[in-house]
């Protein structure tokens, strides 16, 4: 299914009852082919979706609320278009379920089917909301740099690294809050923070920040932008290890946080940032 045929940017009709058919899958293959990925993936990872507007009725008709987190594997053939996800979650509002576990099971079944892979689902009920953390991405801020730039479309030529043959490899974690891209269907801006951890030749910090800023007028889904960042850094800077993690601000009660890496490591922290 193409994004142009999704509910995004169209008049909305809100379902009165639970409806799994509202989920609109979008194949990853098209965007990945544009990045030159036609066979085995050069990374693995997860897309972490947090849903803050989930509610349903218990068997006695009393509303229940929860925050849901979905872990979608990067190797899944599809992503779910975000507005369709919002409408799907909204369809739970007037439907009765026996328990929180029953809701979780339905969410896992439906979203896994739409994505074409097993999706993990966690629900946090209202009585546990106080346990949820807020934190900023760890790392050295690139935004501290005072620089000029005038490139606002992705330009990998801005990236460079030290000569790997003559310089010792370094290990760094770098962060920026200046990531912005735009929805390819509606043109609405998507605001994000990005964390880049690598081992390899020293990456030029000013060039990396200019590169991140260069996404400012780019149109692409969150997942596609992170994969492009990963591939451009791999090609231009040739790190031995690389992990890219972005946390985008929420829209329609959902935030999307893609993570891509080429080495084994724990799942990144899902603590929301202040802007989320």
UniProtKB/Swiss-Prot annotation:
Keywords: Cytoplasm, NADP, Oxidoreductase, Queuosine biosynthesis. The active site is at residues 183, 190. It comes from Burkholderia orbicola (strain MC0-3). NADPH binds at residues 82-83, 251-252. Its EC number is 1.7.1.13. It catalyses: 7-aminomethyl-7-carbaguanine + 2 NADP(+) = 7-cyano-7-deazaguanine + 2 NADPH + 3 H(+). It holds the Pfam family QueF. Catalyzes the NADPH-dependent reduction of 7-cyano-7-deazaguanine (preQ0) to 7-aminomethyl-7-deazaguanine (preQ1). This is NADPH-dependent 7-cyano-7-deazaguanine reductase. It is found in: Cytoplasm. Disulfide bonds: none annotated. Homodimer. Substrate binds at residues 80-82, 222-223. Pathway: tRNA modification; tRNA-queuosine biosynthesis.
């Amino acid at each position: 299914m193409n994004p142009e045929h999704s509910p995004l940017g169209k008049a909305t009709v809100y379902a009165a009852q639970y409806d799994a058919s509202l989920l609109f899958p979008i194949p990853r293959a098209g965007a990945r082919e544009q990045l030159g990925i036609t066979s085995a993936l050069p990374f693995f990872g997860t897309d972490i979706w947090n849903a803050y507007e989930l509610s349903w009725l218990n068997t006695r008709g009393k509303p229940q609320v929860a925050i849901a987190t979905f872990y979608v594997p990067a190797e899944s053939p599809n992503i779910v278009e975000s507005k369709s996800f919002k409408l799907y979650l909204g369809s739970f509002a007037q439907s009765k379920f026996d328990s929180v576990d029953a809701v979780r099971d339905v969410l896992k079944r439906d979203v896994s089917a739409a994505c074409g892979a097993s999706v993990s689902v966690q629900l946090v009920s209202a009585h546990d909301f106080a346990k949820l953390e807020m934190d900023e991405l760890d790392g050295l801020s690139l935004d501290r740099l005072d620089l000029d730039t005038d490139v606002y479309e992705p330009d990998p030529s801005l990236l460079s690294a030290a000569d790997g043959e003559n310089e010792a490899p370094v290990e760094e974690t770098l962060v920026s809050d200046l990531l912005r891209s735009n929805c390819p269907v509606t043109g609405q801006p998507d605001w994000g923070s990005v964390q880049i951890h690598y081992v390899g030749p020293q990456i030029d910090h000013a060039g990396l920040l200019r590169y991140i800023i260069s996404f400012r007028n780019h149109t692409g889904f969150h997942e596609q932008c992170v994969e492009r960042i990963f591939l451009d850094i791999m090609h231009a800077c040739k790190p031995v290890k690389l992990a890219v993690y972005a946390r985008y601000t929420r829209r329609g009660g959902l935030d999307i946080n893609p993570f891509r890496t080429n080495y084994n490591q724990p799942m990144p922290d899902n603590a929301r940032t202040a802007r989320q």
